[in-house]
Amino acid sequence: NYFKKKLPKKSVMVGDLNIAPYEEDVWDHKKLLKIVSHTPEEIEALNDVKSSANWVDITRKDIPSGLLYSWWSYRARDWDTANKGRRLDHIWATEDIAEYGFGSHILRDVRGWDKPSDHAPVFASFDL
């Protein structure tokens, strides 16, 4: 596994992983179980990667509960009102620095800009 063999200490991985692993990372867990980005197979694969190097999901460490999304479909013109999102963008850190991560937030308002991405920026700070 690449993430385990070549992983330096004090690592942070960020990106659009296109998988929403938790029930509160999608607008309707049961409806999305057969939809790409929230299938049991994808969640299991992502969890395997996460556990292979003991990655810590910094966003969920900081915001452990509640609905949390970083993506809303372009097909939904009323994306803000409908709020049918998914948390597809992640910030993970190795255990040795995870405790220093704080202040995670998603800039939801950016999704409402003229000609926006369907993803909103995800932030976390680290006091190293």
Give, region by region, the residue ranges found by the protein language model.
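Acidic/histidine-rich, metal-coordinating catalytic segments
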Residues: 9-23, 27
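A long, amphipathic alpha-helix that forms part
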Residues: 1-8
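Metal-dependent phosphoester-hydrolase catalytic domains
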Residues: 22-128
